[in-house]
Amino acid sequence: MDKQQLAKMIDHTILKPEADKASIEKLCKEALEYNFASVCINPTNVELAAKLLKGSEVKVCTVIGFPLGANTMEVKAFETKDAIAKGADEVDMVINIGRLKDKDYEYVEKDIKAVVDAADKKAVTKVIIETCLLTEEEKVKACELAKKAGADFVKTSTGFSTGGATPEDIKLMRETVGPDMGVKASGGVRSIEDAEAVIKNGATRIGASASIAICEGKVSDSTY
């Protein structure tokens, strides 16, 4: 895989709360230079990114119910509609982790579907299951519910919890959702070796702030 192909699999990410206008402008400039799949940013920065990336192939991705997933489904649906109205092409939502652990699967599915329905095929939907907090059984169940709810992707992590993507989790997620659904690895992908390991196990998208280091074959000390 060459640098260009790898770049098209990466969501160039800045989700830290202190990200200012200059940070977003820099992120978008880098995304245009490398032709990354998208920039992944907080909702407050969607309008600016959409303006900066207008007319390019680079998509605007934002996060919903982030990073805890503990908002109500009505709030997540509103966030989704608002983000799309402001220019988001992709939305990465966090599941209700507590309800999953309660085995309240009907709620978890409805929560995901609220975002899928709010996106109304106007945006790609990715479902963050926060693998580091789940048992193997819970990871499988979360992926099954995301697929059943009609989401486009399952995603490992927010990057704000106790761990990120592992090749083993990506393999399990891919085996669970089958060949036709997207699988996004995020959190802890800091080098081309990390990227190759998750791609080999079934990842079709990578979320990283170390995107340039990955493409240039370097190693980043970034935590996301």
From Swiss-Prot:
Give the main location: cytoplasm
Q: Per its UniProt record, what CDD domains does this chain match?
A: DeoC
| Positions of the catalytic residues | D92 (proton donor/acceptor), K155 (schiff-base intermediate with acetaldehyde), K184 (proton donor/acceptor)
Enzyme class, UniProt record, top EC level: lyase
> Where is it localised?
Cytoplasm
Its recorded reaction(s) are:
2-deoxy-D-ribose 5-phosphate = D-glyceraldehyde 3-phosphate + acetaldehyde
Q: Which GO biological process entries does UniProt record here? A: 2-deoxyribose 1-phosphate catabolic process; carbohydrate catabolic process; deoxyribonucleotide catabolic process
Keywords for the protein's UniProt record, in alphabetical order? Cytoplasm, Lyase, Schiff base
What range does the record give for the signal peptide? none
Q: In which pathway does it act?
A: Carbohydrate degradation; 2-deoxy-D-ribose 1-phosphate degradation; D-glyceraldehyde 3-phosphate and acetaldehyde from 2-deoxy-alpha-D-ribose 1-phosphate: step 2/2
Q: Which GO terms describe its cellular component?
A: cytoplasm
What's a single GO MF annotation on this record? Answer: deoxyribose-phosphate aldolase activity
What EC number(s) does this enzyme carry?
4.1.2.4
The organism's place on the tree of life at top rank? Bacteria
Stated family: Belongs to the DeoC/FbaB aldolase family. DeoC type 1 subfamily.
Entry function: Catalyzes a reversible aldol reaction between acetaldehyde and D-glyceraldehyde 3-phosphate to generate 2-deoxy-D-ribose 5-phosphate.
Q: Under what name is this protein listed?
A: Deoxyribose-phosphate aldolase
The organism is Clostridium perfringens (strain SM101 / Type A)
